[in-house]
């Protein structure tokens, strides 16, 4: 899946263009344009760096369509709305986990050289609502935070009219459960 983030003039409504592997293209609406890293890039980078295949971007690759997405071109699969709703219900907890992990890594990225103990403390505080058997290590979180800092710097240097393009190459792990047989 290819995802392109155009750098628009400040204060315009931002968006990205999502080209899924099935040929369907969506426009994903985001927040206001500016020099701050868009929220959707943050999630893409964090999920990619932590290998999260069942989060927001893995869900989009698998066929989830969020309310902030507009179909641009390409033949949508049959029953796309029902399939998307089922995927969102089935993977709701994993999407929440991806949101919280993104927030955690964004917080770590804002710190000046955080220690492993500081990352562990933040992890405990920010992920306390999750049931995660084993969260990523402080080293993995620190590496994801560094990648996020690099992307934030790239975005801040980008002038209106430029764009950042990403490849989502992680495997699709979201699967639609089979409906129960009716008797």
Language-model segments: which ranges?
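Metalloprotease/metallohydrolase-associated module, dominated by Zn2+-dependent proteases
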Residues: 1-7, 11, 18, 25-28, ...
